[in-house]
Amino acid sequence: MVKISKEAALEYHESGRPGKIEVKPTKAYRTQTDLSLAYSPGVAYPCLEIQDNPDAAYRYTDKGNLVAVISNGTAVLGLGDIGAMSGKPVMEGKGLLFKIYGGIDVFDIEVNEKDPEKFCEAVEKIAPTFGGINLEDIKAPECFYIEERLKRTLDIPVMHDDQHGTAIISAAGLKNALEVIGKDIKKVRLVVNGAGAAAISCTKLYMALGVQKENILMLDSKGVITSDREGLNEQKKFFATDRRDIHTLDRKSVV
């Protein structure tokens, strides 16, 4: 991995126009006619078409190519709960990746709300603007509830990147690695060092590919997650092992 200094990173974000993303027009705007089509009076016609048929928004606006990257800053990369505004550079960075690799337009939205219900309400109210929602850097277990609720209440795709993006990439790596060494995915034993959103989602996808639940050992900050431990959330309970002989990753006990 390339080593990046603090000075270089700050200079990158500060130089020229601060930040990493911007909005650019996609239609002509040089003449009075252009502006009259883009705004008043011409803009009234697509508005009325959308009023008659909401799906027309995909024909006359950028809705279909516009994704909201939304976070409350409670689990930002390796920084933890640093707050919504502090996470903005990460959300802009994700917007940059959407654009350069997928041609998808992004608005980064930082919501200063930790309560899952209120956070969902905020997203639901702005959802008509977008063709998709990318949830980003929201801590577990709240992120599981938020994603499931928004999938139920919204009529556009909802993805929690820390769960599903990570899971897809790591599952591809696992599948290819097992193919290279000639091992059956149904017979391998898997140790998952972590029990946050990414780890939970990754492990569920590994199981969908064939990893057997009884062959999984998952750890969190307190050690191996066992079924006799109190205070586990529902996600951790699902992966808790019934083994009573193992609480750490001592080689002898794992073997």
What residues fall within each predicted segment?
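N-terminal ligand-binding/catalytic initiation module
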Residues: 1-158
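Acidic, His- and aromatic-enriched active-site or binding-groove loops in soluble protein domains
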Residues: 163
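Glycine-rich phosphate/diphosphate-binding loop of Rossmann-like nucleotide-binding domains
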Residues: 77, 84-102, 160, 168-250
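Conserved small/polar residues in nucleotide/adenosyl-binding loops
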Residues: 252-255
